[in-house]
């Protein structure tokens, strides 16, 4: 449905759209804003960023090492300069359906790269995240996936 300003239906849409926008665009409370401002001005935000960068760098390196040790026979891990995800390209395209089925069966959730594409036809790959997981959880998941794919 396409409605223009000249359309009589336009007037009927104003109130519902205003309500939707006011619900969607609610701002943080003054106390939340003041707390965040203090968090930033007193240096806690910078400290937090440094801590998280260090943590994510450790997890990133751990993921790369473990992934390559356990799964390099099935995947080529693309290592970006930055970010919290990796793309793992299947060495054998015919394995895509099996890997997709196995990951669902064992509860590991790398997304197929195709989920992020509208029209592009890419070679089969999966997107793995690492930031939310401890090294022990990363190892456990990768071992589980490698074992299930043998």
Regions found by a protein language model. Give the residues of each.
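PLP-dependent class I/II
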Residues: 1-150
């Amino acid at each position: 449905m396409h409605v223009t300003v000249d359309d009589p239906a336009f007037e009927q849409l104003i109130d519902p759209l205003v309500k939707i926008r006011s619900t969607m665009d609610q701002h943080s409370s003054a106390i939340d804003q003041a707390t965040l401002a203090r968090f930033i001005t007193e240096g806690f935000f910078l400290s937090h960023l440094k801590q998280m960068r260090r943590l994510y760098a450790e997890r990133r390196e751990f993921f790369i090492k473990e992934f390559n040790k356990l799964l390099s026979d099935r995947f080529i891990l693309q290592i970006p300069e930055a970010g919290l995800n990796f793309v793992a390209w299947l060495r054998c395209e015919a394995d895509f359906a099996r890997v997709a089925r196995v990951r669902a069966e064992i509860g590991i959730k790398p997304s197929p790269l195709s989920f992020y594409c509208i029209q592009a036809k890419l070679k089969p790959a999966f997107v793995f995240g690492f930031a939310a997981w401890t090294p022990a959880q990363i190892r456990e998941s990768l071992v589980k996936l490698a074992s299930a794919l043998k």
